[in-house]
C-alpha cells in the first residue's frame, strides 16, 4: 500500500500544471460529467489508460517478486492481496459502504481544494490518501479507483505467477462500484453546498 501512496504522490508532483481532474485521477464517470472538469470524449480513453497503467504496474511487481512467489504459497502471502484489494471480513454491504465512504471523503476533499497552490496540492492529497488508508485500509484495502483494483486483479489472473491463489473475482464488483458511487455522491454533495 505504501508503494501505491508513493506512486500516487509522484504522479501528482509530475502533473502539477494539469487540471483539477488530472491532478488527481480518483474521479469517475459520474463526477466527470457533473463537474465538467474533463471532456467526455476523453473519459473512456482515460479509464483504459488508468487500467492499463495499473496492469503494467502489477506486472512489474510480479516480475520483481517472482523469486518470492516460487518459494511461497497462498497461505504464506502469495495471494491477490499483493495486487488488488480484498476484505478483511467478507461482508459485501459493509465492504461496499467502506469503499463508498472512503472515496466520498477523498473526492470531496479534492473538490474543496479548488484553486490551492499547485505545489501544495499533491502534498495535501498524499496526506489525505494516507489518512484514508489508515482509517479504511484495514476493512477493504481502499481501492478509491476502479482501475487501481481491476488492472492488478486482471494481471494476477493472467500472469503465470507460481503457486498463486484465487483472484477473488466474486469480490471485484465492490472496489469497482463503490468508488463510482462514492465519487458521484461527493460531487452531488459538493454542488449542493459549495458557494
Q: What are the roles of these predicted feature ranges?
A:
Residues 1-195:
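Membrane-interface helix-loop junctions and terminal tails of multi-pass membrane proteins
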